[in-house]
Amino acid sequence: MKAYQREFIEFALNKQVLKFGEFTLKSGRISPYFFNAGLFNTGLELAKLGRFYAAALMDCGVEFDLLFGPAYKGIPIATTTAVALAEHHNRDLPYCFNRKEAKDHGEGGSLVGSPLEGRVMLVDDVITAGTAIRESMEIINAQGATLAGVMISLDRQERGRGEISAIQEVERDYHCKVIAIVTLNDVISYLEEKPEMADHLAAVRHYREQYGV
């Protein structure tokens, strides 16, 4: 685990974005942890979040020309990541996002920001069912752009209804790499370093054995 990944886990814990306990997911599964990136909701937190996304993007080795943030959660993530790439990595890249409803006046259409073209890096918080990715792919294809990769904050490394995860389905269906700042494996590695969190470690490991990929 790299330094920025450990820092991200600590950041998420401090802001209650990552919590341990018992949580019922939409799937009905009882999870020993919960991750809600929507709780990064101040200017300082958003700026810091962008730096973590930028660090992971620079680390991943995937070439891309533009950041795309799907509405709604992807919009602030794309914005703060673009700022962080420019300020901290000297990469001044365009970004773009979609509206849920197309406007018929002013800045018309469903896209806002830079023209959607070239190799697109889609940024979002998490992938649960892959629905947002499929919707985004329709937009990207309609503009003649190509999907270079998908960047998220956490990969739960968890099976969907079948034998593979929603992330693995996205990688298979769209022939792209899904990059995460951290994975569940990283969270487990972090817990292993903290003797006071042994109970949580056991619960997360058990969950991984049941539902992991």
From Swiss-Prot:
Disulfide bonds: none annotated. It catalyses: orotidine 5'-phosphate + diphosphate = orotate + 5-phospho-alpha-D-ribose 1-diphosphate. GO terms for cellular component: cytoplasm. GO terms for molecular function: magnesium ion binding; orotate phosphoribosyltransferase activity. It is an enzyme of class 2 (transferase). Its cofactor is Mg(2+). Keywords: Glycosyltransferase, Magnesium, Pyrimidine biosynthesis, Transferase. Orotate binds at residues 34-35, 128, 156. SUPFAM superfamilies: PRTase-like (SSF53271). It comes from the Bacteria. Pathway: Pyrimidine metabolism; UMP biosynthesis via de novo pathway; UMP from orotate: step 1/2. Catalyzes the transfer of a ribosyl phosphate group from 5-phosphoribose 1-diphosphate to orotate, leading to the formation of orotidine monophosphate (OMP). Homodimer. Belongs to the purine/pyrimidine phosphoribosyltransferase family. PyrE subfamily. This is Orotate phosphoribosyltransferase. It comes from Yersinia enterocolitica serotype O:8 / biotype 1B (strain NCTC 13174 / 8081). The lineage of its organism: Bacteria, Pseudomonadati, Pseudomonadota, Gammaproteobacteria, Enterobacterales. The gene is pyrE.
